[in-house]
Structures are given as structure tokens and as C-alpha cells.
UniProtKB/Swiss-Prot annotation:
Function: Catalyzes the formation of 2-amino-5-formylamino-6-ribofuranosylamino-4(3H)-pyrimidinone ribonucleotide monophosphate and inorganic phosphate from GTP. Also has an independent pyrophosphate phosphohydrolase activity.
Protein name according to UniProt: GTP cyclohydrolase III
Catalytic activity annotation: GTP + 3 H2O = 2-amino-5-formylamino-6-(5-phospho-D-ribosylamino)pyrimidin-4(3H)-one + 2 phosphate + 2 H(+)
PANTHER family: GTP CYCLOHYDROLASE III
Record keywords, A-Z: GTP-binding, Hydrolase, Nucleotide-binding
GO biological process: biosynthetic process
InterPro entries given in the database record: GTP_CycHdrlase_3, Nucleotide_cyclase, Rev_trsase/Diguanyl_cyclase
Enzyme class: hydrolase
Source lineage: Archaea, Thermoproteota, Thermoprotei, Sulfolobales, Sulfolobaceae
Similarity comment text for this entry: Belongs to the archaeal-type GTP cyclohydrolase family.
Amino acid sequence: MKVLAIKLVDYREWTERLGYDREWLIQKIQNKFMMKIHEIASQYSTFPLQLRFDNFLMIVDGITNTQLIYMINDMQENLPVGIKTCLGYGKTPLEAQWNASVCLNNKEDKFKEYVDEKIAALHFDINFNTEALKYTSVYDSFLEITNIYVDLSRFLYKIGGILQYLGGDNYLGFVSTNSVNKVIEKFSDDNKIKVGIGIGQNARTAIKLATTSLEKIRNNREKTWHIEEE
């Protein structure tokens, strides 16, 4: 699988130049440029996992190196600082992002040609969480969401996957297609979490299919997982 690691260069120095009354401004600018990056990424059929904001990842199977270069140039035009990128390859998203992350410390940004793989996207949703907000505090609900995020992250890490919190009670994961059965086995009898699985040629398609799967689970309340494949 192919993962593009993206690092914002001199990001900390940029934030420090904004003065002491800067946290609101940092959040405003971060959200503004991440909105633009999401828009650009969608045009190239990928999806940014924003993670730390100053470092983020993209699953880029199904995208040519020429397209990646155009995408990176488009992103650079919309960021307040420079960027450094590196393309990593691995049998799993976890391995690919590790290789891409190590590569960021090297001086060369050259992209090698790698074989494209199908992408398995996972859209997780917590059962009854919205209803539970009637009986708990906003902060306690957030703590539960965070604890589940940690548990899901650890599970996916063990099978070579990566995870992003989407907001609300939703999470987005990626695994290799070889690990899909492990996900099904884990959540087939789980009455707390449902997972929509999508398999596609690129990240955007896989995510769309995962969300389609999740909607089908919601319409069929007896199931905890469903899979759609391109």
C-alpha cells in the first residue's frame, strides 16, 4: 500500500511569530487550511488523516506519481509554511506510513514507482452514543469517545491499520484487504460498535463504500458489520 507523509516545515516557528494571544488564531488558520487540503485531496480521490495538523498522512493507492506532484503543489499554494513530503510503501497502511515517516528525515523527496493496491476503509460508529448524551455530561461523553478511540487504535495497530477520529462518535480506519476478516471477526458480535467496510481502488471510493455499508447496517439493526466492494 502507498502512504504519503506530509510535514509542515518550520510550523512551530510560524506559530510563535503570531504573538502570545495566538491560540484562537492558530485554530482558525489550521481549520482553514485543512478545509482547503480536504478539498484538494478529494479532487485527487484521496483523504488526509490530519492527526497532528503539522504532520499528516494520505492513503494514495490509485494515484499516479504525476498526480501526486500536482496535488502537493496545489497544497503548497494554500499553506502558510513550506511542506516536505515522502511516499512510503508497505504491506499494510501502518508499515507504509512508517516507511514514509522515516523517509521524511532524508534529504531527497523523489517518488519511487510502487504497485497500487485496493484500499479497505472502515467507518466505525458507536451504538446509542447520541442517546446517551441525555444522561451524561458533554465532557464525560467526550472521555468515552476518547477511550474508544484508544482501544480501536490499539486493535488496528496490531493488524497493521491506522485510525482517524472524524468527530461525533465516528472514526475512520484503513487496513490492508488481507486484514478485513480480522476486523469482521472482532466486531461481528460487538453490540457497542458497528463498522461499515468499503473496498475500492482509491481512498475516496473506499470511504464512500464504507459509509454506504454503515448506512445499510443502520437500516438493518440486526447486523454489526457490512462490506461493499468496488
